[in-house]
């Protein structure tokens, strides 16, 4: 696996799909950034338009000029842009859109569970994130715990009460606490608190050094919420370090039922770390069936002892941790001859699992129809919309048919697999030139460069956070 080169470039290496770090220009601002105006950059969406520029002075009066505004047509990724045309974002399709610039780009991040309530819909919003950096110097890397507050609605229409925001400062606030780490962070995942747990906020990070660290970030969150509360040096140290991996990796996931952590590496191995009897312990032997690097893994949302994994060997596998041989129970040749970069288990319909591959194809599988023997299976749905590798995929936590997909083509596509068109609707789409657009494709978010990961916020319905080489976006579309 190639490493980052300390040179002036912002390009990510493409090998191993989503698990590749990028290099950062050495002239970037090394201070933690701020929120930027949501519409300062041309952040593109499904409702992107091409606008033809007109002449500055054409002899028409104001009324005639209003009647002769530049024509606007929907633009789709891959479409042609002429020299006299420009892309103009349509802010009306976002209820909220904020852009955050950070000190170092995050290859991976996670949204932290909080105690502010479920199904939050009232503005402004507040959330907590954690991101792992990829700095120019290996010794400059850090985990950043962030508090984002005053996330106001950025879409205003005639129905909004003018008095609601007239006296309110709408600039979002970003506060953060950092933990120094050695080596770039390949993956970071926060644990969701199991029932009756006394532990508050556990975090795991997988680094280019091959080390997996487990952290307690409760002190950092308390410090963010209570100005003046300090974080000690001891609290900036990991609770436990997994030393079993021979090389770095990108696969990491916490069990939703208990404090059990799975980590998969580029040596094809998966290790299980558990908390029991007051301490952490990692199994001495790995789960071993994959024949190439393990790219992603996830615990079953419904079965305590079951997890899935995907690999550069073109397969995804289902495992049972009780199997003493530590081999997979089911092998599916999901994308033969192609790296399977990511997977996501549907938390509301546990028999559905989605995978994303290096050729831009993503598929949905019904586990009930798969046989125990290794064979080429048929997905219940498969799409080739993205023009580059799939880097992230995640089911909506509240809508069982909705899924978000990130591609290396700088798109985040949002889909509703329940959508079906009748013949009349199909004819109408064809007349609009949309016959090549899958009807299940509901929204396209663009504007970031080198997007690597996205997550739905479990407690703020429809809200998405994404990380890229150019920073972090926090947004909510009018679609979901």
Swiss-Prot record:
Q: Which UniProt keywords apply?
A: Cytoplasm, Nucleus, Phosphoprotein, Repeat, Ribosome biogenesis, rRNA processing, WD repeat
> Principal localization?
cytoplasm
Cite the repeat ranges for WD: 183-225, 289-329, 334-375, 385-425, 446-480
Q: Where in the cell is it found?
A: Cytoplasm; Nucleus, Nucleolus
Instruction: Write out the ranges of the annotated region (Disordered).
Output: 1-78, 155-176
GO terms (molecular function) for this protein are: protein carrier chaperone
Which GO biological process annotations does it have? cytosolic large ribosomal subunit assembly; ribosome biogenesis; rRNA processing
What superkingdom heads the lineage?
A: Eukaryota
> Keyword Nucleus on this protein?
yes
Where along the chain is composition biased (Acidic residues)? 28-52, 158-172
The record, for InterPro entries, names: Glutamate-rich_WD_repeat, Histone-bd_RBBP4-like_N, WD40/YVTN_repeat-like_dom_sf, WD40_repeat_dom_sf, WD40_rpt
Give the sites modified to Phosphoserine: 163, 166
Task: Give Gene Ontology CC terms.
Answer: cytosol; nucleolus; nucleus
Subunit description: Associates with ribosomal protein L3.
Q: What does this protein do?
A: Involved in regulation of L3 expression and stability and plays a role in early 60S ribosomal subunit assembly. May be required for proper assembly of pre-ribosomal particles during early ribosome biogenesis, presumably by targeting L3 onto the 35S precursor rRNA.
Please report the name of this protein according to its UniProt entry.
Ribosome assembly protein rrb1
Q: What is the lineage of its organism?
A: Eukaryota, Fungi, Dikarya, Ascomycota, Taphrinomycotina
Question: Gene encoding this chain?
Answer: rrb1
């Amino acid at each position: 696996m190639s490493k980052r080169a300390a040179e002036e470039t912002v390009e990510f290496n493409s090998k191993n799909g989503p698990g590749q770090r990028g290099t950062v220009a050495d002239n970037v601002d090394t201070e933690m950034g701020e929120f930027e105006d949501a519409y300062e950059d041309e952040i593109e969406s499904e409702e992107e338009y091409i606008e033809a520029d007109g002449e500055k002075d054409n002899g028409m009066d104001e009324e005639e000029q209003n009647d002769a505004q530049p024509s606007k047509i929907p633009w789709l990724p891959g479409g042609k842009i002429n020299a006299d045309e420009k892309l103009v974002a349509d802010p009306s399709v976002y209820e909220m859109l904020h852009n955050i610039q950070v000190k170092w780009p995050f290859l991976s991040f996670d949204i932290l569970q909080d105690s502010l309530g479920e199904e939050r819909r009232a503005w402004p919003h507040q959330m907590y994130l954690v991101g792992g950096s990829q700095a120019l110097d290996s010794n400059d890397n850090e985990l950043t715990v962030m508090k984002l507050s005053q996330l106001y609605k950025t879409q205003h229409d005639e129905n909004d009460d003018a008095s609601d925001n007239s006296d309110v400062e709408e600039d979002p606030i970003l506060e953060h606490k950092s933990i120094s780490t050695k080596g770039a962070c390949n993956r970071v995942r926060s644990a969701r608190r199991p029932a009756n747990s006394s532990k508050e906020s556990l975090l795991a990070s997988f680094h280019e050094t091959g080390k997996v660290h487990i952290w307690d970030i409760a002190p950092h969150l308390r410090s963010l919420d209570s100005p003046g509360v300090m974080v000690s040096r001891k609290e900036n140290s990991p609770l436990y370090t997994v030393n079993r991996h021979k090389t770095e990796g990108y696969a990491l996931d916490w069990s939703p039922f208990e404090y059990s952590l799975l980590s998969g590496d580029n040596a094809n191995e998966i290790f299980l770390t558990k908390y029991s009897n007051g301490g952490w312990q990692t199994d001495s032997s790995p789960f071993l069936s994959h024949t190439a690097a393990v790219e992603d893994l996830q615990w079953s949302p419904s079965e305590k002892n079951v997890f899935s994994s995907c690999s550069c060997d073109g397969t995804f596998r289902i495992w049972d941790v009780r199997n003493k041989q530590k081999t997979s129970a089911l092998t599916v040749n999901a994308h033969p001859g192609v790296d399977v970069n990511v997977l996501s288990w549907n938390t509301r319909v546990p028999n559905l699992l989605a995978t994303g591959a290096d050729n831009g194809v993503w598929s949905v599988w019904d586990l009930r129809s798969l046989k125990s023997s290794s064979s080429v299976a048929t997905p219940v749905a498969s799409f080739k919309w993205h023009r580059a590798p799939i880097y992230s995929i995640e089911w909506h936590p509240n809508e069982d048919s909705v899924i978000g997909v990130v591609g290396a083509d700088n798109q985040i596509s949002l889909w509703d697999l329940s959508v079906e068109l009748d013949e009349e609707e199909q004819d109408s789409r064809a007349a609009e030139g949309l016959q090549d657009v899958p009807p299940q494709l509901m929204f396209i978010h663009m504007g970031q460069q080198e997007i690597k990961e996205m997550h739905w916020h479990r407690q703020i319905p429809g809200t998405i956070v994404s990380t890229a080489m150019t920073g972090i976006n926090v947004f909510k579309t009018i679609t979901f």
